């Protein structure tokens, strides 16, 4: 089994109305419960807006701190889920299900394992 990162990318701007967001969150909770029951769920979390980020950069002996996101963009990492799956196809299926619930782009990426692949 391998771990995969399912990254949720959301656009800048106003979040959905409360009634829409409540429905999404309920469906997201049901999907998380299904992932747990299948032994696939490892961890998940939502992130605050990019404006709350702090970037740390070590440069020639100095630690530089910058407020705001590392890169400016129209979409940003809004949350993520880590799943354990036997193969990429299984991880992609969880990613597909997540994309259907949140209606946002999902990037599926495997973690580097100890063997280095």
Cite the ranges covered by each PLM segment.
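Conserved, structured core segments of small domains
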Residues: 1-117
């Amino acid at each position: 089994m391998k771990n995969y990162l399912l990254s949720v990318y959301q656009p800048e701007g106003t979040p959905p109305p409360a009634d829409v967001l409540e429905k999404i969150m309920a469906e997201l909770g049901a999907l998380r419960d299904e992932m747990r029951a299948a032994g696939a769920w490892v961890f998940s979390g939502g992130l605050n807006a990019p404006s709350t980020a702090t970037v740390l950069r070590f440069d020639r002996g100095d630690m530089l701190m910058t407020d705001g996101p590392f890169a400016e963009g129209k979409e940003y990492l809004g949350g993520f889920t880590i799943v354990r799956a036997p193969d990429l196809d299984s991880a992609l299926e969880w990613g597909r299900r997540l994309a259907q619930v949140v209606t946002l782009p999902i990037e599926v990426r495997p973690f580097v394992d100890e063997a280095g692949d």
